[in-house]
């Protein structure tokens, strides 16, 4: 197949039509990312100082949250050993102080909402309304220029302003990102691919603290909205999920009542009770986006233990197993679209049909490759600069398996009453950063679909 030709065509169509997309509501997590590029000698020294025998058990199994330095270092090792991302809440004040003293190499916009706001509003020119739990001066400065808005209430009236015009000096919400390249070695472990571990060290995003503007004026905000992307539920626990979930359910009911398609951007959620709660409200969403670790964690709470294990058994992950898991999730919840993204390929299972689903995936993959290649995408025309990045050769086996099992043609197949769309991604050999790649993929694909409708 001429995938490069399909990539070029998809980009042109979405670039020409993305201006049709109206306001996209983004909630709930925005923060500041403090990025540290790991160095072998430094990490080995820190593990030695913390006690190697104390650290290594957490590289086998992640804790639910981080309460000590050995848990932090072991969790970083867990990600390195597997080349997989993970994010955990840092509860311990002494560990937060340790991370602050360890320092960072750069500060960037963080949180799924913040990253997607800068991409959709600052790069694509799609107007967004963002939920920002704390609008510090530094947080506001990290937003790009463009149609990015936050609600502000003055004299009892709601208006939308750019974050830089909000003029508040609230707290800094900092998350620490520990990045490593493919082949990164520490002791006898080697990273099979580039990725990162995230230590969340703020109490607003992790408790999904919802701003009063969103509590009191959500109906009015929703009136101004055409699409919604919900994220940030991953740090909730059995102890703190009930209050925010009540508000979130109310928000979902409002969106559903107004016929506004909402996408849930899933993320690694350690707490089983919270995963079950998310599963319970998934039917209120149009769409959900996840990777193999996240899909396996959902299969686990659905009682599909064997399927969960199979999802993590092979690299690249078996597309037939992924499809079976997506079918089970769609049939159980009624969610209309499931977007699966992994290193090397994407799949979308939808209860509707059309090549635009595949083309939106292609646009998303090109945007992700551009972000990996350039570090920062300044405008939509920067996306096309990734056209020279090669299509993943290993995905040929994935395509062959899907063709054999489902009779896939041109990246599209009919499976059990659903359409399955497939694309191979473009792989940047030495990415400048991996932070925000997943958010770039999911928001570009979701909004890209509606640009082509």
Curated annotation (Swiss-Prot):
Main location: cytoplasm
Record-linked Pfam families: ADP_PFK_GK
ADPK domain location: 1-453
Cofactor: Mg(2+)
GO biological process: carbohydrate metabolic process; chitin catabolic process; glucose metabolic process; glycolytic process
Signal peptide positions on this chain: none
Gene3D superfamilies tied to this protein: 3.30.1110.20, 3.40.1190.20
Disruption phenotype: Disruption of the gene severely affects growth in chitin-containing media and leads to an almost complete loss of chitin-dependent hydrogen production.
Catalytic activity: D-glucose + ADP = D-glucose 6-phosphate + AMP + H(+); D-glucosamine + ADP = D-glucosamine 6-phosphate + AMP + H(+)
EC number: 2.7.1.-, 2.7.1.147
Keyword Magnesium: yes
Pathway: Glycan degradation; chitin degradation; Carbohydrate degradation; glycolysis
Subcellular location: Cytoplasm
Residues annotated to bind ADP: 291, 341-342, 428, 438
Organism domain of life: Archaea
Family annotation (PROSITE patterns): ADPK (PS51255)
Family indicated by similarity: Belongs to the ADP-dependent glucokinase family.
Described purpose of this protein according to its UniProt entry: Catalyzes the ADP-dependent phosphorylation of D-glucose to D-glucose 6-phosphate and glucosamine to glucosamine 6-phosphate. Involved in chitin degradation.
Family annotation (HAMAP family): ADP_glucokinase (MF_00809)
Record's protein name: ADP-dependent glucose/glucosamine kinase
């Amino acid at each position: 197949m001429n995938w490069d030709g399909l990539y070029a065509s998809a980009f042109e169509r979405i670039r020409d039509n993305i201006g049709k997309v109206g306001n996209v509501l983004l909630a709930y997590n925005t923060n500041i990312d403090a990025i540290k590029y790991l160095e072998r000698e430094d990490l080995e020294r820190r593990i030695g100082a913390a006690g190697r025998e104390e650290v290594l058990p957490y590289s086998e199994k992640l804790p639910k949250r981080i309460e000590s330095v050995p848990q932090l270092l072991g969790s970083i090792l867990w990600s390195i050993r597997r080349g997989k991302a993970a994010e955990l809440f840092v509860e311990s004040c002494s560990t937060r102080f340790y991370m602050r003293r360890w320092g960072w190499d750069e500060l960037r916009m963080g949180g799924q909402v913040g990253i997607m706001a800068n991409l959709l509003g600052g790069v694509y020119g799609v107007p967004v309304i963002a939920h920002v739990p704390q609008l510090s001066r530094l947080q506001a400065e990290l937003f790009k220029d463009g149609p990015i808005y936050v609600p502000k209430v003055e004299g009892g009236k709601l208006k939308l302003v750019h974050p830089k015009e909000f003029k508040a000096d609230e707290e800094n919400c900092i998350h620490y990102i520990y990045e490593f390249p493919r082949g990164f070695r520490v002791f006898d472990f080697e990273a099979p691919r580039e990725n990162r571990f995230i230590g969340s060290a703020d109490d607003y995003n992790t408790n999904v603290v919802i701003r009063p503007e969103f509590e009191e004026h959500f109906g009015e905000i929703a009136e101004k909205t055409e699409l919604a992307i919900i994220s940030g539920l991953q740090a909730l626990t059995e102890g703190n999920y009930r209050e925010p979930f009540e508000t979130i359910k109310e928000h979902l009911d409002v969106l559903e009542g107004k016929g506004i398609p909402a996408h849930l951007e899933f993320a690694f959620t350690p707490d089983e009770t919270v995963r079950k709660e998310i599963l319970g409200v998934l039917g209120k969403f149009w769409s959900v986006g996840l990777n193999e670790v996240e899909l396996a964690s959902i299969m686990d709470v659905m009682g599909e233990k064997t399927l969960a294990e199979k999802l993590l058994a092979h690299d690249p992950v078996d597309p037939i197993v992924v499809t079976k898991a997506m079918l089970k999730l769609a049939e159980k919840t009624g969610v209309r679209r499931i977007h699966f993204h992994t290193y090397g390929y994407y799949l979308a299972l939808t209860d509707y049909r059309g090549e635009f689903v595949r083309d939106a995936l292609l646009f998303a993959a090109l945007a992700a490759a551009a972000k990996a290649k350039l570090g920062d995408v300044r405008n939509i025309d920067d996306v096309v600069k990734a056209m020279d990045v090669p299509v993943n050769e290993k995905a040929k086996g994935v395509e062959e398996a899907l063709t054999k099992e489902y009779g896939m043609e041109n990246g599209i197949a009919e499976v059990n009453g659903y359409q399955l769309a497939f694309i191979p991604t473009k792989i940047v050999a030495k990415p400048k950063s991996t932070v925000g790649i997943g958010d770039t993929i999911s928001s570009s694909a979701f909004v890209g679909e509606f640009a082509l409708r």
